[in-house]
Swiss-Prot record:
NCBIfam families: PRK05113.1, rnfB. The gene is rnfB. PANTHER family: ION-TRANSLOCATING OXIDOREDUCTASE COMPLEX SUBUNIT B, OXIDOREDUCTASE. This is Ion-translocating oxidoreductase complex subunit B. Belongs to the 4Fe4S bacterial-type ferredoxin family. RnfB subfamily. Its EC number is 7.-.-.-.
Amino acid sequence: MLDLSIIAYLLIAICLIALIFGALLGYFSVKLKVEADPIVDQIDAILPQSQCGQCGYPGCKPYAEAIANGDQITKCVPGGQPLVVKIAELMGVDVPSMDNTAVPEVKVALIHEDMCIGCTKCIQACPVDAIIGTNKAMHTVVADLCTGCELCVAPCPTNCIEMIKVKQNPRSWNWQFNPDLIIPIVNTTELQKKMIVGSAKGEIQND
């Protein structure tokens, strides 16, 4: 059997080695730390975080990094034109004109409920919780929440999910507006009151 003093020395040596390695790791983590670009975090914060990949990047953070490096700010389909305006304001650039930009076809997922087996795989895949349902029960897509990312299609074992085009109506139409052309609202009632009071004062002075 080993002497207790030897065991104690071994434990002390192991603790000292662990402390030394811990100190070295802490030192190098600070010394070799790579500072992240703050603009990337700011862009990433306003992206929808759906991680849908429709922009051509594997997630929102890589797309934020690409924007910071000069890529187009119009590639986020779920964010739409309002997001483009926010990113343009953050980057201090002009809002890109949408006249010559192809508008992506808006689609949402549709579950054929007669084929659904209630496996919940599409629910787990949906990044925006747009699918409702429980285990071994039919699932349904909440169209207003669906971003059309198609991430729910591949996991479905019965191929009961179809991407359908959204019919354009005043509610679903992608209203692409230029914020510089917004006309401010004027309170005409107050304006009329001031004109009446002003004309009344003029009449009194003339009398």
